[in-house]
Amino acid sequence: MAYDQLTIRPYTAKALELKNQKASNLDIVVPVIKDNDHNYLIVEGENFIIEFNKHNGYLSRYEADGMQLLNPGAQLTPNFWRAPTDNDYGAGLQHRYAVWKNPGLKLTSLKQSIENEQAIVQAEYEMKAVKGKLFLTYVINNEGAVKVTQKMEAGKEEKVSDMFRFG
């Protein structure tokens, strides 16, 4: 049985950076953001199309090199729930954490911009059930690679149960 744990070499995670890909003698083609559709915010590049649903802010279409990477009807959504384990059931956590199964996300803002020759889409949500806010940021480079960042701010005075997962 171990009594202590020693750190031999501390682990430092590398920053997840998304850079544009450049061919040797070709200029970078900046993604184009089209905001003229009533239902979708569209980000297009030479070889990809990405659509965001304007009603809920979710990434709803991802096509690269003519191939659908998201099934029709599917959406990339934030998740705060996982299937409870036997130990969770024994502790009654499926009831205590139930508010996180559907925290009532309501889109309050969907913004887009071009920065550093990359498309940026930012969605802000109000989470009524847990009195918090959620911020999703999508950075899209010229090849159609997407970096998704999720940040949540909890209500300061609210007493909300823990969550199973954040992701």
What is the role of each PLM region?
Residues 3-4, 39-128:
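Acidic-aromatic substrate-binding/catalytic surfaces of carbohydrate-active enzymes
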